[in-house]
Amino acid sequence: MKPRTPNALLAIAMAGISTLALADDGNGQGNKPCGIPDATVARVQQQLAAVATQNNGGLFSPSRMWSAVVDRQGVLCSVIRLGDAWPGSRAISIAKANTANAFSNDALALSTANLYAPTQPGGSLYGLNNSNPFNPDYLAQGSGIGRVPGGIITFGGGVPLYLDGKVIGGLGLSGDTACADHVIAYRMRRLAGLDKDLKGVATDGTDNIIFANGTPAGFQHPHCGDSDIVP
């Protein structure tokens, strides 16, 4: 893929606009059907248990996570918990899934890690975090399935889901450092086969995390710690 400048890429993006037991945290109370087939959602979420046992460069081993999937309309399809993940990370995982879906299109994939630098003061997307606020009605555990909770998070852990080169939704992970959350989400999506034919801002043409050596610029993300890895 021929390298593109950050400004050119942004123009494209904005134009299109056991201890390892998995617990389902939804009761199906919503009235909007998920636009992703149930089998596909299940295939994504089933990857969490295996990925959590890998070295993901985070604070916990095995990982303790919330994992959320939204469809292209932002409808919450599924949110699950692995281990004693931080309760506050439930809403964050949903918001990450929403962000990755909301700001990716068929021309350009942007993970939430890619959005870190552009949304800092002076960045071309500064203020984005004030858009699409999370609906507090869905903060409670067990709520939000079949609804559109919204939310914007611009640090690692959210990736768009692609099928045949088209965005079908987003996946959000939260429960560790933002860098580890990204690794887990990225690996889950790859194992589920929903990372095909996407076009991203990383040098390899993906939406992988781009670590900054100094102050993050372009589509970079700061390091979270000495154990950080690139999946």
Can you describe what each PLM-predicted range is?
Residues 1-9:
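Bacterial N-terminal signal peptides that target proteins for export
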Residues 13-14:
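Long, compositionally biased tandem-repeat segments
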Residues 24-231:
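Flexible, solvent-exposed loop/hinge segments and secondary-structure transition points
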